[in-house]
Amino acid sequence: MQIRELAERILFGDRWEEKLVALDRYEDSAPGTAFVVPERPGRPVGLGLDEWHGREKMRFRDVGKLHSERERGLVLHFFANHELLALELMALALLKFPDAPQKFRRGVVQTLKDEQEHVRMYRRRMEEIGVEFGQIP
């Protein structure tokens, strides 16, 4: 798969299959032209940035008050949001800077893959304790 195709799927995908697409081998022979920054990334239902307007915001939990699995799951939700945004920013960097040195682009791809794995881990743990990704603005 071309790096550009991967980055576009991640940045604009509105399904987890797109955001977390596995990448074993990739090519960078067609990086294309520099990309214009979109207004917002594509997101799975419930996680769209525009969907959070008007919803009550939750404050980050006080670490000393994390007595239940559910409370810990809500903290994981905050972390998972951070990882998802980092994943999308790595994809954007690949699209925005197609002429960057190959070593840099390969490093960004590796970071992107790491962020995908972090999102997977958070989603798995949240699912185990009954917290759905997207339920907290």
Give the positions of each predicted feature.
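Non-heme di-metal
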Residues: 1-137
